[in-house]
Amino acid sequence: MLTAEEKAAVTAFWGKVKVDEVGGEALGRLLVVYPWTQRFFESFGDLSTADAVMNNPKVKAHGKKVLDSFSNGMKHLDDLKGTFAALSELHCDKLHVDPENFKLLGNVLVVVLARNFGKEFTPVLQADFQKVVAGVANALAHRYH
């Protein structure tokens, strides 16, 4: 999946990420850009407009929770399937989330990182993070196979 150099680069960069801010923005953007994903978050209250979604405290809190899990995965890049096994089971068996949504969220996360870090988020880092989010999406979809 990732070379030792790529792992070092993404891990070092991830230390700069403000998980609470980036998580809320990434989940919010997912819900705005792909509105069908909102059906999994009906208990979150008002998701009727982009502003409502982006300012919703439950979206922000869950986005942080999602990125806290992602951060844990960043510490276990060699065992993403093991790291995300319980979450894969939850999302498959109980929540019935379409695994394609994991790919969408990963891609949105990469966009949010680029937006927040500008030139510091180089094309090489973007390519490395695309590998990471693909690996995480695959690990989360593992239970579906």
From Swiss-Prot:
The modification S-nitrosocysteine is found at C92. CDD domains: Hb-beta-like. One of its GO terms (biological process) is hydrogen peroxide catabolic process. Keywords: Acetylation, Heme, Iron, Metal-binding, Oxygen transport, Phosphoprotein, S-nitrosylation, Transport. Gene3D superfamilies: Globins. The keyword tRNA processing does not apply. Pfam families: Globin. Heterotetramer of two alpha chains and two beta chains. This is Hemoglobin subunit beta. It comes from Bos taurus (Bovine). The lineage of its organism: Eukaryota, Metazoa, Chordata, Craniata, Vertebrata.
